[in-house]
Amino acid sequence: MSELLSIALFLASVLIYAWKAGRNTWWFAAILAVLGLFVVLNITLYASDYFTGDGINDAVLYTLTNSLTGAGVSKYILPGAGIVLALAAVFSALGWVLRRRRHHPHHFGYSLLALLLALGSVDASPAFRQISELVKSQSRDGDPDFPAYYKEPSKTIPNPQLNLVYIYGESLERTYFDNDAFPDLTPELGALKNEGLDFSHTMQLPGTDYTIAGMVASQCGIPLFAPFEGNASASVSSFFPQNICLGDILKNSGYQNYFVQGANLRFAGKDVFLKSHGFDHLYGAEELKTVVADPSYRNDWGFYDDTVLDEAWKKFEELSRSGQRFSLFTLTVDTHHPDGFISRTCNRKRYDFDGKPNQSFSAVSCSQENIAEFINKIKASPWFKNTVIVVSSDHLAMNNTAWKYLNKQDRNNLFFVLRGDQPQQDTLAVKRNTMDNGATVLDILGGDNFIGLGRSSLSGQSLSEVFLNSKEKILAMKPDIIRLWNFPKEMKDFTVDRDKDMIAFSGSHFRLPLLLRVSDKRVEPLPESEYSAPLRFQLANFAPRDNFVWVDRCYKMAQLWAPELALSTDWCVSQGQLGGQQSIQHVDKAQWKGKTAFKDTVIDMERYKGNVDTLKIVDNDIRYKADSFIFNVAGAPEEVKQFSGISRPESWGRWSNAQLGDEVKIEYNTPLPKKFDLVITAKAFGANANRPIPVRVGKEEQTLVLENEVTTTTLHFDNPSNASTLVIVPPDPVSTNEGNILGHSPRKLGIGMVEIKVVNAEG
């Protein structure tokens, strides 16, 4: 209703000003600004819906000041460009309409009415309401009801009898199981759901709407609100350290806790969370690659669901035979947005909807088949009678190719339970949320019926039942939940552990690199993650007087304040204010002690602008002083004009990447010498080893042969044509996820370059 009202007010404002108000420069500017704000808000809402499927939420608020990099981001470039073009077109059209009758005399009353209508359209828009609520949630002191509803469970289960298998289905919400809406989409897993306790109204609350947040909510009974962006949790050393979560209780009760997934465990800090709360046995992409049958059978995120669930079954068999009490948690990935992935063992690899194939529905149909097969193996085993199986979605699906069809339905998360000890079949329509999952499981296992804000749906009352406005209530509790981190409010002394890549201050530990905004009674950590911008881009968003401490590789900050460190990959510490004084120090000891020293100086806006502009220089445009091209740092020597076909820097160097160009091209500012030696330190990837690799300068061509290990080769060139471009052509680029950023499309690797040096041989 508010959406229609806001649009009506917007159109009324445009029409009244365009046809009745006449022209006045100041009124025109004011009305265009307010109407433009309406447009920006609604396009932001549309874009947020596209990425999150949940409007403008906490993740969007974070992203407004940080670039979105990471999982599958290339698939969003075209929609993002379309949004920018649409915004420009709408602004141009709006300005043209408002100036249509510019020669008519100005009318104060109609101008005022148009402005009031424009302001009303902004106030009535859902986007403005969502942003306002989020901003309020950042500034509240907390909710007086929090102490009454937050309850710590007992640390043990009195007499545990049952093993636990808990399956998180990535984005596998209950909506997919509506056979009327999506016929025969989930026949195998749907049949199993109907055999157990099916909780049909599991809503999604703020702070539970992405994977690590859904896991925290389901095990600790609280949403993931933190003093930093949730997916950046990989940088912390402990996760809600004061909370008692399901894993803690299981471990204290004699359970061995296992977790198996196909993606990298470090992503979003899953390893930190699980290790902090009772899990001693973790298996992710790195751990599984030495044990799976086919290590090359992977998707963009890691191993396919059939591989992961096969390993989970092996672990279930092994643990059951041992007689040890255990819990086995697993997380699928094939249904990850925006498209999903199809395991090769599925019987149904395609699902048509609206008369055409739909990749997301196809991935759901395939993944549920894999999950059902895993469950049926357990049910057919002699150990099922001592086992509880839980299947839940980690969160509602984000914007995938099925999302518009899901939104036409009443959407709920999946949560059902299969008990081997006492089979029960029922559909329970009680109102609940993800935070109730862990408490319900704990209740079934014989423990308390509450964890944090979660309550057992079998014997307790969910906050979703108690409060009609449960979403607003949870946002009001956000400051209370953030305080559970026990995060320090000041930073004076700190220690950088060079060997462990950690920084410690005021009792807290963080993985490096790290950027901190330090103010009175608040320290705000800004870690670097797959979803956040590089730290220098985050620092560029700081105000001129914001105090910062930045710990990163020296070369990343050297171009600003210490050019002599431009080739150093050691750790450095920089601190100060972008508009004031800055310092940079080289971490030259294993345990390096530092102190914050912020000076209250006069702000220089020219210095501030220069620092911000330098921080925003993209990697490939950075230049440093050196007599060779060093590939394990960003940028290139000053002599290089441009380069292409080369991937990002890694600790050892850089790979060629045929996704960025079939050839490695390095163009210098001036012609290369008439005679020179080209000294190449490099290695080959896969099938490119021990094969001739053409290296060209102008019309001259030499052949390079590399091994899988790094070697140094010198090639002798004549350059009579004064060519300025060096070209290297990997013979057989291989599509692989080797060393890839989680969620990115595979790279096509050919050669790995450590250093290239041009040595003048004239005279």
Curated annotation (Swiss-Prot):
Chain segments annotated as transmembrane: 1-21, 26-46, 77-97, 108-128
InterPro entries, A to Z: Alkaline_phosphatase_core_sf, DUF7024, OpgB, OpgB/LTA_synthase_biosynth, Sulfatase_N
GO CC, one annotated term: plasma membrane
SUPFAM superfamilies: Alkaline phosphatase-like (SSF53649)
Record bears the keyword Cell membrane: yes
Membrane topology designation: Multi-pass membrane protein
Localization, UniProt: Cell inner membrane
Enzyme Commission number, as recorded: 2.7.8.20
The entry's keywords: Cell inner membrane, Cell membrane, Membrane, Transferase, Transmembrane, Transmembrane helix
Pathway(s) annotated for this protein in UniProt: Glycan metabolism; osmoregulated periplasmic glucan (OPG) biosynthesis
Entry's Gene Ontology molecular function annotations: phosphatidylglycerol-membrane-oligosaccharide glycerophosphotransferase activity
Catalytic activity: a phosphatidylglycerol + a membrane-derived-oligosaccharide D-glucose = a 1,2-diacyl-sn-glycerol + a membrane-derived-oligosaccharide 6-(glycerophospho)-D-glucose
Annotated GO biological process: glucan biosynthetic process
PANTHER family, sorted: LIPOTEICHOIC ACID SYNTHASE (PTHR47371), PHOSPHOGLYCEROL TRANSFERASE I (PTHR47371:SF3)
NCBIfam families: PRK03776.1
Protein family according to the UniProt entry: Belongs to the OpgB family.
UniProt function note: Transfers a phosphoglycerol residue from phosphatidylglycerol to the membrane-bound nascent glucan backbones.
Record-given protein name: Phosphoglycerol transferase I
